[in-house]
């Protein structure tokens, strides 16, 4: 009987904690040095105010452990960027970047920033992969 309250309390605690899951999905081919860009599918969402898809990217080395960073959104143990993508117009707004020496800081007025054309093979690959799966993303 003493276990029932303990189990109930533990269950509430587990459900109250936020899930910190990471599903890094590669969107570029590895370079000759084994570097590859990926995006965190668990961090991606549709911004309710702008309609843009917000996505966190990171560069990692294929075969390294840990392969990708950051360990959580905003943690400064990886190198990457956060973008707001417009899938129809094929453009993006850089929202912020991070590195071990610079924690992630999202620009406060990013929605008012002028978008940049998604150019280059890496941008095209990111747009293709993220936009193809955008219907399943949550809106926040």
Predicted regions and their residues:
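Bacterial N-terminal signal peptides that target proteins for export
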Residues: 1-8
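Repetitive helical segments and hydrophobic/amphipathic motifs
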Residues: 11-12
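N-terminal signal peptide c-region/cleavage motif recognized by signal peptidases
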Residues: 16-18
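N-terminal secretory-pathway/extracellular module detecting exported/lumenal segments
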Residues: 20-81, 86-140
